[in-house]
Amino acid sequence: MHVKLKKKFGQNFLVDKNISRKIFNLVPNKITKIIEIGPGIGHLTDFLLNDNIKKLTLIEIDSDFLPTLNEKYKKIKYIEIINQDIMNMDLSKYDSESIIISNLPYNISSQVLVKINNYCHFKMMVLMFQKEFAERLISSKLNNLNCLIKCFYEIKKEFNISKNSFIPSPKIESSVLTFKKKDQSLLENNDINLFSIFKSMIFINKRKKISTILKKNKFKLDNLTHLDMRAEEYNLNEFVSLYKKLKPELINKFS
């Protein structure tokens, strides 16, 4: 590693080739377009080079890595290197058949995941997170982190990664998760912003009963059920159903 790592970018680069190979093996053979967020100097990228790939987009915020990436992949015509912050990009222009792969920076994992999910048209993602963060995502209990993305994706934990597989080593283990787009989403894309407001309102008071939260926010409780439960006691379908029943009032209050 010849480039100085920057703490502000939360850089921990995967250098274990066996793990990189396992990650690539999660990519279906039919995939021809890949977007990698945060390639660094290409440790994982090297394993994504394949005869099936027609387009490989590398999005790297740190300009210090560009000379290495440009030199390393200058002869590969299907690679596009973009020096930009993923948080400032319009992802709608990318083909929904593309697969997103990333070892997401630990310090902005949540923000990047929300950003990607706001487009929610990608068929599949393979993402690495800190193990504790990953456990919250795959938890069977609803929480403020997982309830929106589970409306659009099936999430599966594939394997854990030792902290020794990275440079510099993070403090805890990581996990690789796959996200596969549901055939039938539980929400429409235009519900995302309003549902995000709703879930935040509920989960910021997660220890309180739903009835208490709704009364506090002056919602009508007529024809609503399961109000004596807490948010984490709902299953996903019940929670979405509650949102849809309250949607007219939510629109009036927050739109």
Please give the residue ranges for each predicted region.
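Catalytic cores of RNA-modifying enzymes
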Residues: 1-201, 241-244, 253-255
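Conserved Class I S-adenosyl-L-methionine
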Residues: 205-207, 212-255
